Amino acid sequence: MGRTLENKKSIVAELQETLSQSQLTLVIDYKGLTVAEITDLRKRLRPTGTLCKVTKNAFMRIAVDGNQTWQPLQSFCQETSAFLLVKDDLGGAIKAYQDFQKATKKTELRGGVMEGRSLNADQVKAIGDLPSKDQLMAQIAGAINGVATKLAVGINQVPTSLARGIKAVSEKEAA
């Protein structure tokens, strides 16, 4: 027995809702993956705020139809498609997928869509090479901490230098 019209509409509505919360969508060919491997991919992606959706291409085409941001996604909807819907950590999600791809050697990245632009595999890899959100926050925190440390040392040196100067003058006068 096939899906009911209401069921199909709810699937499309769920896809539209998930897309509205996503910054980047990657399309991969998942042919040859076992259920255990797809589950492993989902586990790797979960900490980065990414969902792995395996759905019919027709549902995804309907979900993005008329939406300028995700319209280019239609060109990737062919054969066996899994959609990686990235909400937060773009670089982390791409790195997690690349690690999975190296481990299984079964999937192929078709491309992605970000801010209404279609991305090829090289462009997606370039985004993945950018530092992750956590790395950027650590770099900023380190820079702020470094400035505060230098300021504290500088403020501490002024009275110390002044005290040394006064002591030297008093010793000179006493002699």
UniProtKB/Swiss-Prot annotation:
Keyword annotations of the record: Ribonucleoprotein, Ribosomal protein, RNA-binding, rRNA-binding
An example Gene Ontology biological process: translation
UniProt-recorded Gene Ontology molecular function terms: large ribosomal subunit rRNA binding; structural constituent of ribosome
Pfam family, one: Ribosomal_L10
Disulfide bond annotation, renumbered to this chain: none
InterPro entries: Ribosomal_uL10, Ribosomal_uL10-like_sf, Ribosomal_uL10_bac, Ribosomal_uL10_bac_type, Ribosomal_uL10_CS_bac
Superkingdom in the source lineage: Bacteria
Presence of keyword Ribosomal protein: yes
Entries under SUPFAM superfamilies matching the protein: Ribosomal protein L10-like
GO cellular component: large ribosomal subunit
Family: Belongs to the universal ribosomal protein uL10 family.
Function of the molecule: Forms part of the ribosomal stalk, playing a central role in the interaction of the ribosome with GTP-bound translation factors.
Complex formation: Part of the ribosomal stalk of the 50S ribosomal subunit. The N-terminus interacts with L11 and the large rRNA to form the base of the stalk. The C-terminus forms an elongated spine to which L12 dimers bind in a sequential fashion forming a multimeric L10(L12)X complex.
PANTHER family tied to this protein: 39S RIBOSOMAL PROTEIN L10, MITOCHONDRIAL (PTHR11560)
Name under which the protein is recorded: Large ribosomal subunit protein uL10
Source species of the chain: Cyanothece sp. (strain PCC 7425 / ATCC 29141)
